[in-house]
């Protein structure tokens, strides 16, 4: 089978929404080429430093690549992708160059080439994310391993917004907590909360592709007894009192349910938000405070921030 590689030159801010657009269009895998990765020291499973090739990365911005099967619907699909990406401008998302190129690759190239980008990555004091095809031996007895398959929707979970959220969950979630994950995507945050011994985790996403992906990942990581994934629009119709609510989605979306999150939390409960580009930090912070929250910590990585707020 022949595959079409769609390459989009964009900004850090636009990486996550564009990746989601590509997955919803049927992309079988997404590769993110970020020059900031060249500055990170990485280790392989044997503790050896491995090097990334600078020729694989742009001088500025980020390149997002996706793969679609070549068929009679490809042209229509690509046009739809372009239109949906351009619509992100309505949400004040900087698209940068926003150049889109298309090339053809064969089955073997597509099936193996993207694996060079993915290795086990330790993202917090406790958590390491491991691609499903890698054999990994924990370095510490209390290390928590999350297995992810980037061939499934929503990538491997090493994007800064996800990393910040997991670091925040590690600090906040206590044994026996009741947790809500809004806009779960891959389900990785729900998996992390379950591994931190939450009593229950309810994960919600409006996108049926995300719901299916999250359910598969929850099962893969053997936390189905704790984490439940359902299709739902943000917090609509949700009741009860909870200890932690986590949301890794666009700042503009977070602003729509800050008050609702406040009402669903117990006194002393925490609202962890991420997916916030630096320039939107103050706007989200003010909205949280207006809803009644106290900001207790702001974490940052590259151009992104995560805000931990307390009721």
Swiss-Prot record:
EC number: 2.1.1.-
GO biological process: methylation
Main location: cytoplasm
One GO term describing the cellular component: cytoplasm
Residues annotated as signal peptide: none
Gene Ontology MF annotations: protein-lysine N-methyltransferase activity
Keywords: Cytoplasm, Methyltransferase, S-adenosyl-L-methionine, Transferase
Superkingdom, taxonomy of origin: Bacteria
SUPFAM superfamilies: S-adenosyl-L-methionine-dependent methyltransferases
Top-level class of the enzyme under EC nomenclature: transferase
Alphabetical list of InterPro entries matching this protein: Ribosomal_L11_MeTrfase_PrmA, Ribosomal_PrmA_MeTrfase, SAM-dependent_MTases_sf
Record-listed S-adenosyl-L-methionine binding positions: 162, 183, 205, 248
Localization annotation: Cytoplasm
Record's catalysed reaction(s): L-lysyl-[protein] + 3 S-adenosyl-L-methionine = N(6),N(6),N(6)-trimethyl-L-lysyl-[protein] + 3 S-adenosyl-L-homocysteine + 3 H(+)
Family stated for the protein in its record: Belongs to the methyltransferase superfamily. PrmA family.
Name of this protein: Ribosomal protein L11 methyltransferase
Species of origin: Bacillus velezensis (strain DSM 23117 / BGSC 10A6 / LMG 26770 / FZB42) (Bacillus amyloliquefaciens subsp. plantarum)
Underlying gene: prmA
């Amino acid at each position: 089978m022949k595959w079409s590689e769609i390459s989009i030159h964009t900004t850090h801010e636009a990486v996550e929404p564009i990746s989601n657009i590509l997955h919803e269009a049927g992309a079988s895998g997404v590769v993110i080429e970020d020059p900031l990765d060249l500055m990170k020291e990485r280790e392989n499973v044997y503790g050896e430093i491995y090097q990334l090739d600078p020729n694989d990365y742009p001088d500025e911005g980020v390149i997002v690549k996706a793969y679609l099967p070549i068929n009679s619907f490809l042209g229509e699909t690509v046009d739809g992708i372009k239109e949906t990406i351009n619509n992100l401008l309505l949400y004040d998302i900087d698209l940068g160059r926003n150049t889109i190129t298309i090339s053809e690759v064969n089955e073997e190239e597509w099936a193996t080439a993207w694996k060079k980008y993915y290795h086990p990555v330790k993202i917090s004091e406790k958590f390491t994310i491991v691609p499903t095809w890698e054999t990994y031996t924990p370095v510490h007895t209390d290390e928590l391993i999350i297995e992810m398959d980037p061939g499934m929707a929503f990538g491997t979970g090493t994007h800064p917004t996800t990393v910040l959220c997991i670091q925040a969950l590690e600090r906040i979630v206590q044994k026996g907590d009741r947790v809500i994950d809004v806009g779960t995507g891959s389900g990785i945050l729900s998996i992390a909360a379950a591994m931190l011994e939450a009593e229950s985790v309810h994960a919600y996403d409006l996108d049926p592709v995300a719901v299916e992906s999250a359910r598969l990942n929850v099962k893969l990581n053997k936390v189905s007894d704790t984490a439940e994934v359902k299709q739902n629009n943000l917090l609509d119709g949700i009741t009860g009192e909870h200890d932690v609510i986590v949301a890794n989605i666009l700042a503009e979306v977070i602003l729509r349910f800050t008050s609702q999150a406040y009402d669903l939390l117990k006194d002393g409960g925490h609202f962890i938000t991420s997916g916030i580009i630096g320039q939107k930090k103050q706007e989200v912070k003010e909205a949280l405070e207006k809803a009644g929250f106290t900001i207790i910590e702001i974490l940052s990585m590259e151009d992104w921030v995560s805000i931990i707020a307390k009721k």
